[in-house]
Amino acid sequence: MTVSKIEVVADHLVRARRDNTLADAAPLAEALADAADAYAVQERVALELGWFGAAPPRYWKSGGASRDAVLTHAPLPPVGVWTSPARSGTWPFHLRGIEAEVALRLARDVDAALAATLDADSARTLIDAMAVSIELVDSRWREALEAPALCKLADLQSHGALVLGDWRAFEARDWRAQSCRVRIGAQAAVERRGTHSLGDPAFMLPAWLRHATRQGATLVAGTVVTTGTWVGILQAAEGDLVTAEFPGIGQASVQL
């Protein structure tokens, strides 16, 4: 891990966020050697911008393209986590990508020792609630979603904001039969069924918990993780009302 290169990438992202501008990822494509470097950038940006203080993050995103892929994770700035029905107001966006997701909430504290013992089944017992979530996808890179993968991971895996619907008790579900419906402004509704990339939103829990506690942090009860899109990335525009509904779980909405 080369600290100076991590600092350079982090400084670009900090400046982009502070000035609401875009940074060029192309010159930095070789600056990050691996995911560990990208996570180090995440941490440095969070520290520079004062997102979490001394406490561990309370909101996260986690997921991957398939069960065979390496899952990725990012802590989310709490100021950009909103309760549905939400309004984005003057929140600065360069993109307005829409992902319909399911968020999960921890029922108890989790430290590194507990996280190390978990498999998918035992991790599910640590969850007490679920909610529909809408992740607003954005980028601080001029190349946006075409930026190098590690640059996107360093930029919180292209995170813009998160909207959370009402919480309900977590329960076993047939996720293959679970449907979702997304409406964006005047566009035709998008409907999907059983399309979560991991087959089960809770599949990522062991990997996420080990990642989030790897440096000795304890995640406290009530910590939330949103678990990946069911609809790919849909496109919205300023002025659109976005609604995501998962029958049997709930819905969430945001006015852009």
Feature roles, as predicted:
Residues T2-D200, P206, R214, Q235-L241, ...:
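Catalytic-core "active-site belt" of small-molecule-metabolizing enzymes
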Residues I184-G185, T227, P247:
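Short strand-turn-strand beta-turns centered on an Asx-Gly dipeptide
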Residues M204-I233:
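A conserved acidic, glycine/proline-rich C-terminal tail/linker
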